[in-house]
Amino acid sequence: MRHVGDRGEAVVAAWLQTQQCQILAQNWSCPWGELDIIACDPGGVVLFVEVKTRGSYNWDRDGLDAISPSKQRKLILAAQAFLESQPQWQEHPCRFDVALVRHQRGAYHLHHYLAQAFTLDSIK
């Protein structure tokens, strides 16, 4: 299943680059988990992008339901760990985005990109 996720992440990374974003890291891991894509947009905002790749017929609204409050907490903790390890990005504003990718018959496409899908306040 990792292969499917990798393909979805590649689609999103390529799309972000067309939006003039700089990819800072992909599949960055720490004890809290993995950050799929970390990018910086043209305005200097650091984007922590969670990518969910699903087939056309799925049970969790194209992966959106998989971004539970518990998952959001882990992503926030991982983002904090990334920023601690990369001090040059600590003063930049940050955003948590979700990218939903669909695949069907070997074709992958970005179905929906949710900018600022959740915030620190949304999980309290």
Swiss-Prot record:
It comes from the Bacteria. One of its GO terms (molecular function) is nucleic acid binding. SUPFAM superfamilies: Restriction endonuclease-like. InterPro entries: Restrct_endonuc-II-like, tRNA_endonuc-like_dom_sf, UPF0102_YraN-like. CDD domains: PoNe_Nuclease. Coiled coil: none annotated. Belongs to the UPF0102 family. This is UPF0102 protein tll1737. The lineage of its organism: Bacteria, Bacillati, Cyanobacteriota, Cyanophyceae, Acaryochloridales.
